[in-house]
Amino acid sequence: YYAQVNEGGYEEGKQLAQTWADYITYNMEHSPFDMHELRGFMQGLVDGGPTKSGHRTPTVIAVLPIGGINEQVMWANYWMVEQVLGSGVHGVLLAHARGPDVSRILVEASRYPHAPKADGVGEGLRGNGGQGFSARIWGVSNDEYQQLADTWPLNPNGEILVGLKIEDRHALETAEASVGVPGIGFAEWGPGDMSMSYNVSRQGGQMPQVLADARARVFAATKKAGIPFLNQMNAQNIEQMIDEGVRIGSGAGAEVADRGRQYTERRMPW
């Protein structure tokens, strides 16, 4: 269960340090790409911590301000991944991920060259010199950070989470291959953008069959890949979603999240 912010700097981070959420989504998909603000936000989390669970900061996953529509876009903008991870966040999420080559570049941009080799992805692209700030945010040495800052579950000891939004009809065509790239850690299906892509409406609480089929395909792809599926949750459907196997709930809020935790008998450390 996560909380989302669409912008914010030091003060906003400090206020969210004691969040109810399991992690924070810092959404730059439709917001300014401001690394000064993001670094301030992360420092605010440190200064407002530790968390209720005793961690230095909450986990933060940043939504990138690019769409993964093809390889050219990814090669032209992979530097954004390095900048974002260099701010000390713990993961990145890519919108409109259309194809396994896009996923591969995203994973490579999230790793260091000396990270453990793996079939299906090439050498990491993160460079030396950018690890100092992120290491301080994590509270570790530069060397320790470089060992920890690798993609899970490709590296079982990695603490970087890389996610995909399979959220249009073009991305759906290669959903299985995209989420199956080693280093991808979770995926979602993006009902809003998928509705626009198919030019259908979800008004009145009814989901058109084409959307239900899209959701089912992405969900099945994550199951095959052995990674979590993210879906919207509310008070009316949270138990159903949990029973179905949804692992990450969006839009839940504190009360709904607590209800889900109680349903799964999950005891929080506070």
Feature locations, PLM:
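Expand to "…catalyze enediolate/carbanion chemistry for C-C bond making/breaking, isomerization
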Residues: 1-270
